[in-house]
């Protein structure tokens, strides 16, 4: 009898807890509804409010009034590539990065012999600190896979820095390389070759194109090996890579030639017309982009020589002449030299 009463009592407690949870949830939803009703533009009364997280501002989408500034971004500090990663990383902590072999989750002992107050460590404790550093390095890189990642990711970072690539490209390249390691695609290939191929694939995925020649200049492997490894990993990892467009090269080439935005816009316009007439198919994107910039610079009164354009684009003057003649003839562009 006593046991039955205990069961009934526990059931009653569970029901009360569930009712309390439902009540709290309804009250929270009601508060959110009230807040949303209050969130209107004081200038025009619009509810079309836009959160600009880059500037930390709340802006009216209709009249442009800045309603609130310097608000706190309550979003996560990490990145996720799929739903599972997003669910696993629902936490607060140090930022996570794929560009470090341990994803930035371990600690590191500084190389300077100073304490947390900036004071120099006594000679008596320096030997102990040296041993701690040595064991910390061994613990961080404890097996062959981690050693592989540590070397490859440092190589990726070096090449990306030499090419001036943004953080997103580095993260993407690190993800591609990690997938190649997980599928055991490194066996029989050099680490430098796979790292260079991963960086080339990441550049194409992020629409920040770099040519194989540019990757070769900063890597320690040949152009042929990079291309062969790239084709292999893109096939094995089923990477979805769109053909590189000549338009993607225009901003970088124009910047290298110190050309104004008018020339860049004209170059893009020429390339779009060429693409509609399928004049870019089967031709190197850098050569077509260089020819379009050469034509646009003449039309806009900021002429650059074929030699200057060729040096920035990494193509020959002959290529520019051939592509320039094709574009001018097919698009009926009159150029006064």
Curated annotation (Swiss-Prot):
Membrane spanning stretches: none
InterPro entries for the chain: Cyclin-like_dom, Cyclin-like_sf, TFIIB, TFIIB_arc, TFIIB_CS, TFIIB_cyclin, Znf_TFIIB
GO cellular component: transcription preinitiation complex
Assigned keywords, A-Z: Metal-binding, Repeat, Transcription, Transcription regulation, Zinc, Zinc-finger
Zinc fingers (TFIIB-type) by residue: 37-68
Record-listed Zn(2+) binding positions: 41, 44, 60, 63
MF terms in GO: DNA-binding transcription factor activity; TBP-class protein binding; zinc ion binding
Pfam families: TFIIB, Zn_Ribbon_TF
Domain of life assignment: Archaea
GO biological process, one term: transcription preinitiation complex assembly
Gene3D superfamilies hit by this protein: 1.10.472.170, Cyclin-like
Sequence repeat placement: 154-237, 248-329
UniProt cross-references to PROSITE patterns, sorted A to Z: TFIIB, ZF_TFIIB
SMART domains tied to this protein: CYCLIN
Keyword Repeat: yes
Protein family per UniProt: Belongs to the TFIIB family.
Function: Stabilizes TBP binding to an archaeal box-A promoter. Also responsible for recruiting RNA polymerase II to the pre-initiation complex (DNA-TBP-TFIIB).
NCBIfam families, per database record: PRK00423.1
PANTHER family cross-referenced by the UniProt entry: TRANSCRIPTION INITIATION FACTOR IIB (PTHR11618:SF13), TRANSCRIPTION INITIATION FACTOR IIB-RELATED (PTHR11618)
Stated name of the protein: Transcription initiation factor IIB
Provenance organism: Methanosarcina mazei (Methanosarcina frisia)
This protein's encoding gene: tfb
């Amino acid at each position: 009898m006593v046991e039955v009463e205990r069961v009934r009592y526990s059931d009653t407690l569970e029901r009360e807890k569930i009712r309390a949870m439902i009540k709290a949830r309804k009250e929270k939803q009601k508060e959110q509804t009230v807040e949303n009703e209050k969130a209107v533009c004081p200038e025009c009364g619009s509810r079309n409010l836009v959160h600009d997280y880059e500037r930390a501002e709340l802006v009216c989408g209709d009249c442009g009034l800045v309603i609130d500034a310097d608000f706190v971004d309550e979003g996560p500090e990490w990145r996720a590539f799929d739903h599972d990663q997003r669910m696993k990383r629902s936490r607060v902590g140090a930022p996570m990065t794929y560009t470090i072999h341990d994803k930035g989750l371990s600690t590191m002992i500084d190389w300077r012999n100073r304490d947390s107050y900036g004071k120099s460590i006594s000679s008596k404790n320096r030997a102990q600190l040296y041993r701690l550093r040595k064991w910390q390095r061994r613990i961080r890189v404890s097996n062959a896979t981690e050693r592989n990642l540590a070397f490859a990711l440092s190589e990726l970072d070096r090449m990306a820095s030499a090419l001036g690539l943004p953080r997103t490209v580095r993260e993407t390249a690190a993800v591609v390389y990690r997938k190649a390691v997980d599928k055991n695609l490194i066996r029989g290939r050099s680490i430098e070759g796979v790292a260079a191929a991963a960086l080339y694939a990441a550049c194409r995925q992020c629409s920040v194109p770099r040519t194989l020649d540019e990757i070769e200049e900063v890597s320690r492997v040949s152009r042929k090996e990079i291309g062969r490894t790239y084709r292999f990993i893109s096939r094995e990892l089923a990477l979805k890579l769109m053909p590189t467009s000549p338009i993607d090269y225009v901003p970088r080439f124009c910047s290298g030639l110190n050309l104004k935005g008018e020339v860049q816009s004209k170059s893009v316009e020429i390339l779009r017309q060429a693409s509609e007439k399928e004049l870019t198919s089967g031709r190197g994107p850098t050569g077509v982009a260089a020819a379009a910039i050469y034509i646009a610079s003449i039309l806009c009164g900021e002429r650059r020589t074929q030699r200057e354009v060729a040096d920035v684009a990494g193509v020959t003057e002959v290529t520019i002449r051939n592509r320039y003649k094709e574009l001018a003839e097919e698009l009926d562009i009159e150029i006064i030299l």
